[in-house]
A protein has these predicted regions:
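Bacterial N-terminal signal peptides that target proteins for export
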Residues: 1-8
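Beta-strand-dominated extracellular/periplasmic modules and repeats
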Residues: 20-141, 148-158
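C-terminal motif of bacterial Sec signal peptides marking the signal peptidase cleavage site
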Residues: 15-18
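Short, ordered beta-strand-loop transition motifs
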Residues: 5, 144-145
């Protein structure tokens, strides 16, 4: 009985450890990267952070999402592979926020609805537009061989 229990436990542990997603070919080592997003010290939760390589195309999704503390851990995603960290290199950084529209904005029969939606979004946006635009963002991050951190105070861009 003990032998069976040992082998069953060994098999379960091996299955969990040995079944990790393998990195895609050509993926360089990943470096730990954290981004803190706040508005004059007040953490901003649920802010998406995206990283665009300044040279070439990564071929992978590079992003993160802030928690209640305003901190996002950068992740590299390629197919079913998903791991914390970014490959070394230089990146432009953009932010995005999800704003829930109330049900009354779901009336597509109203010809003025698109304009009303845009007005609502503009009134409820907390991020400066420049930080959301990949072509205009002033936010940059260089990831070297050691852990990288970026502190973004959005109040500086309002």
């Amino acid at each position: 009985m003990k032998r069976t229990l040992f082998f069953a436990t060994f098999f379960i542990v091996f299955a969990f450890i040995g079944c990790g997603k393998t990195p895609p070919s050509g993926l360089p080592p990943l470096v730990s990267c954290k981004v803190k997003v706040h508005d004059n010290g007040r953490p901003l939760p649920k802010i998406g952070v995206a990283f665009q390589r300044t040279e070439g195309h990564a071929g992978w999704s590079l992003n993160g999402l802030t928690g209640t503390d305003g901190i996002a851990v950068a992740r590299t995603i390629a197919g079913s592979f998903d791991a914390p960290g970014l490959p070394t290199g230089s990146y432009r950084v953009t932010l995005n926020e999800r704003i829930e529209l109330p049900p009354e904005f779901n009336n597509d029969d109203d010809p003025t609805m698109a304009e009303k939606r845009q007005k609502y979004l503009a009134e409820h946006r907390t991020l400066p537009e420049i930080l959301c635009d990949p072509a205009r963002t002033p936010l940059e991050l260089t990831v070297t061989g050691s852990a990288a951190e970026l502190d973004i105070d959005v109040s500086r861009f309002k």
